[in-house]
Amino acid sequence: MRILFDKNVPYPLLRYLAKHDVRTAEELGWARLVNGDLLRAAEEAGFGVMVTADQSLEYQQNLKGRKLALVVLSTNRIGVLEKHPDRLVAAVDAAQEGGYEFVRYELPPKRKPGCLG
């Protein structure tokens, strides 16, 4: 399957999807494309899934009738994402044409300024 990583997705995650043809928006010169334009370009280029950390896309874009699926990550913090790469893999595998898959990650609690612990 052809998968596109949006510019806000850390590229080290590529290794967890090695069985797929994964490209990044930056690699393709699409870093300045946003929302609908990026989805349209991805679809026209034959991508089946786009992975993004832009949680607002669900409300901005209607995928009904599109051939592209969207996998939305709840964070783009690589330290958090790499603790559970299986969640990304499962979401990509479950992605259906014209649909959304949401991948939730728990963030560590924020430390108060000046606290060492």
Tell me what each language-model feature is.
Residues R40-A41, K67-V71:
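Short, hinge-like loop/turn segments at secondary-structure boundaries
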Residues A69-K112:
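C-terminal structural segments of small proteins and small subunits
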Residues A42-N62:
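Acidic, metal-binding active-site segment of PIN/NYN-like and related structure-specific nucleases
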Residues C115:
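Small, basic N-terminal interaction modules of short regulatory proteins
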Residues L13-K19, L57-R66:
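Short loop/helix-cap segments at secondary-structure boundaries that form the rim of catalytic
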Residues M1-G48:
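N-terminal first-folded block
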Residues W30, E58, N76-V80:
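Glycine-/small-residue-rich active-site loops that bind phosphorylated ligands and cofactors
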